[in-house]
């Protein structure tokens, strides 16, 4: 079993993610364990597939192997674009302007993305609308707030939990705090992680991996 462990430290809090070798684990399973895993994943697949179908019907562009809550799907519109192998646990995404999410992105629960503000220098106090682009291999964990002044989170960016993001995040930067500031650079991205498996949404990937057994 190959395990990769990395830490993010911000505000004196440490986080650890343990990633098991997905392909090796599935290929070495007994037939009984494989079928059991398939049954569990089928139940989750039905739920997540329904959400994706609803989001697409509402005009959103959704890639393959995407896990998202039903509540987000019901609020989706043509401003939402999501790539492949994405896990989203929040429904607090402001879709009054385009939000583009790349491939292999992880967004945790209670994270909020805001794309609209007000013109504080105007007597009418009218709305000001912005969009957000989240590039590939970005990790946004729990309870992050992304304000309209942030327009892009670049490739491999990581934001620590509870942070308030007020400006763009550079590629491979690890940021945290309020306001979020960079405190280190990420050494690699999670290329070996099957992102959709984090919430049990890997029904198709699970089957394909098993079938490729040599």
Predicted regions and their residues:
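Ala/Thr-enriched low-complexity intrinsically disordered regions
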Residues: 10-13
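Left-handed beta-helix
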Residues: 64, 69-70, 83-84, 88-90, ...
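C-terminal segments of enzyme domains that contribute to small-molecule binding surfaces
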Residues: 26, 126-146, 178-214
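Residues at secondary-structure transition points
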Residues: 77, 96, 125-129
